[in-house]
Amino acid sequence: MKRPKLKKGSKRLSCHKRYKIQKKVREHNRKARKEAKKSGTRKQKKEISVPNNAPFKAEILQEAQRRRQQEEELKQNRKLERQKEVAKRRKLDEKKKKNSEKREKRDNKKNKGTKAAESAEVVSCRHVNKVLEQSDVVLEVLDARDPLGSRCAQAEEAVLKSPNKRLLLLLNKADLVPRDVLEKWLQVLTAELPTVPFRCLPQAPSKSPGKKHKVPNTADLCTENRCPGGQVLLRILHSLCPSQSDAIKVGVIGFANVGKSSVINSLKQSHVCNVGPTKGTTRVLQEVRLDPQIRMLDSPALVVSPQNAPLAVMLRSVSDCNVDVLAAVSAILKHCSKQELMLHYTLPDYRNSLECVTLLAQRRGLLKKGGVPDTEAAGRLLFNDWMGVRMKYYCQPPDSPGVQPHITKEVTAAMSSGICSEQLAQDNASTLKALKCPSPANLVVFTSVGPTGAIMDERQLVEPEPIEEELEANDGEEDVEEEHEGSEEEEDEEVEQEVVSAKEQEVVSAKEQEVVSAKEQDSKSAGPSVSFDQAQEDDAYDFNTDFV
């Protein structure tokens, strides 16, 4: 309270009020310290300053700086070690996760068993064997452009093992070969087995192959004018029936893209089998009833053996996914006439297959960015033309027919029994007259690579449980990789340690040089020299004697 006639009031307080204020101040400071501790803001430590009149001030400051740098390096090294440990743990967790996933996959594969190992080739081989077992007469469909290359000795041997089965050859696509060449092929093949030339009706891909779609505007599709060879084949099949009441099953076999399903559609006069421009359309066995006495069995394509020539594998295999286009084109060009191919594509003279494909790309405008010829696209174009109908080619029959080891005179007589050879020759001659054969000038002569081998036993396609061996090998590889990674990490750590030690040595040497230079300067300025090492050795330091 301000006293009268005085400018300032008294600072005297009651003890109760003073103690109360002090208590509030203490509480406030305590809360402030607590908040500062939570927020992480701490009081900066007061730097230890060295007085100017202290001896060896430069050395002391350098020593303090060196210790600070060492502490900082230790912090960085600890941080790197922690990061490495975290990365190692993360890698271990990822490896454990991958191993658990692989174990699950391994268990699933074991549970599935052999069903998971089955492929499309195994299924095709199985259905072909079913057709051979159920058939009374086997009809092997050959491509008239290359009859020798589309013939399979393994399938013929499988048919001839059973004495009650008959084997016939059907020379399909007979309208794509010159007439004189076709006559020579008929003479060669008929000397071994009964052979019938055939031309299928134009086939349209059926959207629903299960239904029978009648072809419009065709009263009699299987006449000699529309389907040459159809009546001859039906007559032979009817003659092989044991009686009018008994029906026979005729199995149709052959390699891919020879026209097995098209033959059945032409004989049935409707689209009962699925057909398409791609190979391997038929995947399973299909039974079609032509009449009360004949039942046709459509089969998948024969599985090509990988031991054949590369060109035979490319031309006869079902899948074209793994085909090297440029290698296939190179093999095709080696087996066909160069001049005829140049005339067909209007190309100049070329030296090798790569130059041919390059010229074809320039001719057709197949260019990449910058006008570079697209050889891959040109090779695919030539390969597709050869596999399709755009490239018209044929093979010359051999001068001396080769003797097939499984075809003997007894086999030929047994297969021809019940079939009049003279009548068959007359029917084939009339079929050739009904065909519209092309001129040899418009075709390319192709050299056949010989008969194509097939795989008839599905056990040759299924490997005996390779899953466990592969997984064990993979585990071994992973262990080797882990050891390799561990050794690499150890080497990296050793290199890092060497680098760090080298850096430390450099820093220490630099500091020693600085200390020496500082000593020289101090000695010059101070006059009498004082040994710092001696001072370190003497623990008792006397300021009265050593410091002036």
Swiss-Prot record:
SUPFAM superfamilies: P-loop containing nucleoside triphosphate hydrolases. GO terms for biological process: regulation of cell population proliferation. Residues 1-45 have a biased composition (Basic residues). Residues 64-107, 501-523 have a biased composition (Basic and acidic residues). Residues 58-114 form a coiled coil. One of its GO terms (molecular function) is GTP binding. Residues 465-497 have a biased composition (Acidic residues). The keyword Coiled coil applies. Keywords: Coiled coil, GTP-binding, Nucleotide-binding, Nucleus. Pfam families: GN3L_Grn1, MMR_HSR1. It is found in: Nucleus; Nucleus, Nucleolus. GTP binds at residues 172-175, 256-263, 298-301. Residues 1-118, 459-548 are annotated as: Disordered. In contrast to other GTP-binding proteins, this family is characterized by a circular permutation of the GTPase motifs described by a G4-G1-G3 pattern. This is Guanine nucleotide-binding protein-like 3. It comes from Xenopus tropicalis (Western clawed frog).
